[in-house]
UniProtKB/Swiss-Prot annotation:
It comes from Pediococcus pentosaceus (strain ATCC 25745 / CCUG 21536 / LMG 10740 / 183-1w). PROSITE patterns: RIBOSOMAL_L10. It holds the Pfam family Ribosomal_L10. Keywords: Ribonucleoprotein, Ribosomal protein, RNA-binding, rRNA-binding. One of its GO terms (cellular component) is large ribosomal subunit. Part of the ribosomal stalk of the 50S ribosomal subunit. The N-terminus interacts with L11 and the large rRNA to form the base of the stalk. The C-terminus forms an elongated spine to which L12 dimers bind in a sequential fashion forming a multimeric L10(L12)X complex. Signal peptide: none annotated. This is Large ribosomal subunit protein uL10.
Length: 168
């Protein structure tokens, strides 16, 4: 193999390692058996959520994971592998891929990295059931607003009662 080819492969490994480090979530799937239309649909769903799906050779993934400091992923990088990288939302890739896998037997989740930790299939499935960050923030805001809303209703009830008494 020429020095140029080796340098090119090393650059790809470096690029994938950097992408693994920068991503809050990287889910590895086996998409063997998916039709072109199904892959296109999956890519569109992921792209709409800001997630990149790349098909990467297992040897490149193994070396990149080691370089990025993620050990113990050799059993994940077996067979055809595609990786969904998300730099913003750790939950979105797991949700989208699990939903797609539930409706399509040809897609299987193999493992991945979530928030800098190696994640097995069970962990990824657990993440897939969590609400998104925006939903969690909305729930939190609702909980903060609940006491204020209760006070407002109580004050309104007192004001209504007072106006009824004044009218009578």
């Amino acid at each position: 193999m020429s020095k140029e080819a080796i340098a090119q492969k090393a650059a790809i490994v470096d690029e994938v390692a950097e992408q693994l480090k920068e991503s809050v979530s990287a889910i590895v799937v086996d998409s063997r058996g998916l039709t072109v239309a199904e892959v296109t649909d999956l890519r569109k769903q992921l792209r709409d959520a800001g997630i990149k799906l790349r098909v990467i050779k297992n040897k490149v993934l193994t070396r990149a994971a080691e370089k990025a400091g993620f050990e113990g992923m050799d059993d994940v990088f077996v067979g055809p592998s595609a990786v969904a990288f998300s730099e913003e939302d750790a939950v979105a890739p797991a949700k989208i891929l699990k939903t797609f896998a539930d409706s399509n037997d040809n897609l299987s989740i193999k493992g991945g990295i979530i928030e800098g930790e190696v994640a097995d299939i069970d962990t990824i499935n657990t993440f897939a059931t969590l609400p998104s960050r925006e939903d969690l923030l909305a729930m939190l805001a609702n909980e903060f607003m609940s006491p204020v809303r209760d006070v407002a209703y109580a004050l309104k009830a007192v004001a209504d009662k007072k106006s009824e008494e004044d009218a009578a």
